[in-house]
Amino acid sequence: MNEEVEDGEVKPLELSSEDKAILVETLKNKLQALAEQHVDVLESLAPSVRKRVDVLMEIQSQHDELEVKFFEEKAALEAKYQKLYGPLYSKRSKIVSGVLEVQGETEEREEKGVPDFWLNAMKNNEILAEEIHESDEEALKYLKDIKWCRIDDPKGFKFEFFFYTNPFFKNQVLTKTYHMIDEDDEPILEKAIGTEIEWHPGYCLTQEVLTKESSESTKPITKTEECESFFNFFSPPQVPDDDAKIDENTAEELQNQMERDYDIASTLRDKIIPHAVSWFTREAVQDEDYGASWVDDEEEDDNNDEYSDEEA
């Protein structure tokens, strides 16, 4: 697959019109089916009920107009507070890395900062824990800080992963950028771009070398294969080149991969970065478990109520 590399970033292929149409065919079919169901429902109503539903739809339109303003004001408010968070994140980074000493520390200390802070914070989150493999952990111990910011042209957001000098790769900063488009007043992922990691020889974590013994007279056969790694996050799912045919199953698989990738990004942006110390101490894990338990209890109560009604 051909890719363009510029400024250390791998740019995804531009899709032909045919590929784009095939890739979104499944979604279009679903939307078409929903539209047909909408018409069927309206046509099945009695005239008097249909008039009432028409008024309800007008009310919904007014609600949707207000919702657009809500999202606009929400974006402005988020931008305001993101700037206010900045100094706090900076101080946190200095303490974690050992640049800033905390008052009241004893002079006798074996190591600076908070070792493995980001590694443990991410491992304590269920979604990210699935992405971090044992082979990744040593490299992630060199992770110094994670930042994110919104971008306007094109619209989206960007991650920066800052690393200490390490034996695994040359990059000091790994980035991941998400380009979004507005569709029906809701941001939709268009594409993601990740840094090309410059691995040191023999330290690549996204590939493994397999060796197969051959006859005594010849050398062993070796081949390189892709393997699971957290660092695949910086190589987002790509669509095959224009010559390849994308069937419905492939399109659905790509969609699932992109959704998974975006889930990881959302977790980093909305949970890990703003509440890193709570994930490090596992306080956030307890909060999530409590929330899930509360929902389960509510569902159980609802089920019990249903059984009681049936018995009555």
From Swiss-Prot:
Report the principal subcellular site.
nucleus
Pfam families in alphabetical order: NAP
Recorded GO cellular component terms are:
chromatin; cytoplasm; nucleus
Q: Which UniProt keywords apply?
A: Chaperone, Coiled coil, Cytoplasm, Nucleus
SUPFAM superfamilies linked to this entry: NAP-like (SSF143113)
Q: Where are the transmembrane segments?
A: none
Chain spans, region Disordered: 289-312
Compartments, as annotated in UniProt: Nucleus; Cytoplasm
Signal sequence extent: none
| GO function terms (MF aspect) | chromatin binding; histone binding
- InterPro entries in UniProt: NAP-like_sf, NAP_family
Segments forming a coiled coil: 24-78
Which residue numbers does the motif Nuclear export signal cover? 45-60
GO BP annotation list: double-strand break repair via homologous recombination; nucleosome assembly
- Domain comment (free text): The acidic domain is probably involved in the interaction with histones.
The record's comment on protein family reads:
Belongs to the nucleosome assembly protein (NAP) family.
What's this protein's function?
May modulate chromatin structure by regulation of nucleosome assembly/disassembly.
Any idea what this protein is called? Answer: Nucleosome assembly protein 1-like 4
Tell me the organism: Oryza sativa subsp. japonica
